[in-house]
Amino acid sequence: TYAPALDNGTINGASVIDDYPMLLNGEVWPRNANWRYQGLTALHTAIAQSLNTCAVRTNLAYGVSNSYDFLVDKLGFENLTYTDSQQVGNMALGGFEKGVTTEEMSAAYAAFVNEGVYTKPRTFIRVEDANGNVVLENEAQSTVAMKNTTAAIINHLLQEAALNGTGYEAQFSGMHIAGKTGSTNSNKDRYFVGYTPYYSCAVWAGYEHNQRIVASGNPCSAVFRKVMSAIHADLADKDFFSCSGLTSVAVCADSGMLASENCALDVRGSRVYTALVAADNAPTAVCTMHTAPTYTVNMADSDGNVTTVTGSVLNYQRELIEGHDEIVVEDAFMMLGGWNGFFGDEADDDFNMPDGDHDTTVAGPPDTTDQPSNVDDFIRAG
């Protein structure tokens, strides 16, 4: 989902995707593994935390059938069907009609290591007779699957997923690794596909009779770690490839745009981070999502001193699925019109603090004239 969308510019390395579900046949879909929704989410977080909603929204933005074509034509997946090409759940979440093989997955991920070049798997290179004469040659078949900048960004993102995300159990000392976990409903199938600068490896675990895998962690990550650590025992650590055409930019984690001063003043803490992006698809506009209301805070000391502090909130109002308001989205509390009643809906509203022990009054509302429009398939590419 993410690699082809990066490759054609649908998203960039700083994009923000809405971790919020949709309605499918009247039901809330998709669910995340942790049954939580964070709202506006930076791409690197969406991948590291395996957020299904973000994968679905990205796939819809890129095109379900386009995703199918990319996997079949560029990355050598041979078992995908026409039904897969028409279903976003299949293409975004891996719910394929016939499934894929670990060989296909390992070969596809190897393209990220090889600067975007896909090489068809082969079990032998050549056959020689007793005299060393070559009687059968099995030449490599390679094609350019994606830009080298796309592969480099994916490497960067999947390193974070393996280091701080769901793939942390696959780590072993002395080697750079990148990778991604996977699972099916009720953990009846588990996956880990990862790679180093030397090798790629895909691991699947499951029972013959489709039973739930009960484990404290992901058994595939543990297998990957044991196998790959042995293979790399005598290999020197090295980083993944670098290439021209990349740039690092300071961006807002809530808008995907270039960071402003207000992004660092978010009431949750600074929302500024550095993203790796392709130079020809980098964000150019400064964040319009953050606005900074000024609070006069009564310190309630004996001399009646008053201190003025500044914070910022998201200049955006979340649309909720009608009839499903019980779905709590974490970022809604940081937006204008947040559910906790902290912020007014209109520019002329008085701001009121939530009930409780406090000495704070709000001096004035933020400007809401530039509030972005709300769309169900919210993806910001900067």
Briefly describe each language-model feature range:
Residues 1, 67-68, 223, 227-228:
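Generic structural signal for hydrophobic residues
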Residues 1-40, 75, 119-133:
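Short, glycine/proline-biased beta-turn/loop segments that scaffold the active-site neighborhood
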Residues 7, 11-12, 45, 98-286:
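A penicillin-recognizing enzyme superfamily signal
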Residues 11-16, 25-27, 42, 61, ...:
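Extracytoplasmic/cell-surface-exposed regions of Actinobacterial cell-envelope-associated
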Residues 17-22, 34-79, 85-114, 159-160:
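Active-site-adjacent helix/loop patches that line small-molecule binding or acyl-intermediate pockets
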Residues 18, 69-75, 136-144, 181-186, ...:
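A short, terminal or domain-edge coil/loop segment
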Residues 249-379:
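Low-complexity, Gly/Ser/Thr/Pro-rich intrinsically disordered linker/tail segments
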